[in-house]
Amino acid sequence: MEAVKEKNDLFNLDVKVNAKESNDSGAEPRIASKFICTPGCAKTGSFNSYCC
């Protein structure tokens, strides 16, 4: 059985971010999210529609 030498960068957590320049004019949406509501309204928080 032959031992395998581990690489030094196994736990390298450095992250490279390629951010594009932008302004704060709001021309493009920053967060794109959607709400999923069930039909009907209820007062409890058991995945009933809180979106009413």
UniProtKB/Swiss-Prot annotation:
**Signal sequence segment:** none
The cross-link described as Beta-methyllanthionine (Thr-Cys) comes at T38-C41
Q: Name one GO biological process term.
A: killing of cells of another organism
Lineage top rank: taxon: Bacteria
Q: From the UniProt record, list the residues forming the propeptide.
A: 1-30
Annotated positions of the (Z)-2,3-didehydrobutyrine modification? T44
Q: Does the keyword DNA repair apply?
A: no
Numbered residues of crosslink Lanthionine (Ser-Cys): S33-C37, S46-C51
Q: Which GO terms describe its cellular component?
A: extracellular region
Q: Per UniProt, which keywords does this protein have?
A: Antibiotic, Antimicrobial, Bacteriocin, D-amino acid, Lantibiotic, Plasmid, Thioether bond
Pfam families (UniProt xref): Gallidermin (PF02052)
Give the position(s) of the covalent cross-link described as S-(2-aminovinyl)-D-cysteine (Ser-Cys).
S49-C52
| Post-translational events | Maturation of lantibiotics involves the enzymatic conversion of Thr, and Ser into dehydrated AA and the formation of thioether bonds with cysteine. The C-terminal lanthionine undergoes decarboxylation. This is followed by membrane translocation and cleavage of the modified precursor. The 2,3-didehydrobutyrine is determined to be the Z-isomer.
- Molecular function terms from GO: signaling receptor binding
Keyword Lyase included in the entry's annotation: no
Q: Which family does it belong to?
A: Belongs to the type A lantibiotic family.
**What role is this protein assigned?**
Lanthionine-containing peptide antibiotic (lantibiotic) active on Gram-positive bacteria. The bactericidal activity of lantibiotics is based on depolarization of energized bacterial cytoplasmic membranes, initiated by the formation of aqueous transmembrane pores.
Name of the protein described by the UniProt record: Lantibiotic epidermin
What is the scientific name of the source organism? Staphylococcus epidermidis
